[in-house]
From Swiss-Prot:
Pathway: Purine metabolism; AMP biosynthesis via salvage pathway; AMP from ADP: step 1/1. Keywords: ATP-binding, Cytoplasm, Kinase, Nucleotide biosynthesis, Nucleotide-binding, Transferase. It is found in: Cytoplasm. Monomer. The gene is adk. This is Adenylate kinase. Belongs to the adenylate kinase family. Gene3D superfamilies: P-loop containing nucleotide triphosphate hydrolases. Its main location: cytoplasm. One of its GO terms (molecular function) is ATP binding. It comes from Clavibacter sepedonicus (Clavibacter michiganensis subsp. sepedonicus). It catalyses: AMP + ATP = 2 ADP. Disulfide bonds: none annotated. Residues 31-60 are annotated as: NMP.
Length: 200
């Protein structure tokens, strides 16, 4: 059973690597964005609450996000483990997740932090925006998103570092190269791919 969490700044390829790690280990890539969209699409009770908040231009509060994640982690495909992407985002969510897993007799195996030089990431995203014709995605906006990421995730990263769970990996480079770095870093912690990954 493998229980992982991945964090990384915009432009560091977190979404791509999350899918690779999940496929490698035969576990679901659990993204809060996907959970919100699926619940809205399925018109679940919680999904309708999310839709109302989004329509009003409000953030989804911790309590509702926590409930949605709890329901998702109880689904059959997450029983052999999971990779969380985009959750937790606040210290309250960190505490909730720890308590939730403890209640199930579980704990996180590792927190993968993709690290990347800010100037390189900004250059990469600026090029991508120009190629895709997104003139509104200028360097100032991109740098602002990097600053928000650092401000929001630094306290979470500090907690996971104190818990001895943090695995730092250079997120820049070819997709396969970064994936191999992650695999090596996790193996060094004793977190290896499931031998039956992908057979289900």
């Amino acid at each position: 059973m493998t229980r992982l969490l991945i964090v990384g700044p915009p432009g560091a390829g977190k979404g791509t690597q999350a899918k690779r790690i999940a496929a490698d280990r035969g576990i679901p890539d659990v993204s809060t964005g996907d959970i919100f969209r699926q619940n809205i699409k399925d018109r679940t009770e919680l999904g309708q609450q999310v839709q109302a908040l989004v329509d009003a231009g409000n953030y989804v509060p911790d309590e509702l996000t926590n409930r949605l994640v709890t329901v998702r982690l109880q689904e059959e495909d997450a029983q052999a483990g999971f990779l969380l992407d985009g959750y937790p985002r606040t210290l309250a969510q960190v505490a909730y997740l720890e308590e939730l897993l403890q209640g199930w007799g579980q704990e996180l195996d590792a927190v993968i932090q993709l690290v990347a030089d800010e100037d390189e990431v900004v250059a990469r995203l600026t090029r991508r925006a120009a190629e895709q014709g997104r003139a509104d995605d200028g360097e100032d906006e991109i740098r602002h998103r990097q600053e928000v990421y650092v401000r929001e995730t630094s306290p979470l990263i500090d907690v996971y570092r104190e818990h001895g769970l943090l695995v730092e990996v250079d997120g820049l480079g070819e997709v396969d190269e970064v994936a191999e770095r992650i695999r090596t870093a996790l193996a060094a912690r004793g977190v290896r791919p499931s031998s039956d990954a992908g057979r289900a």
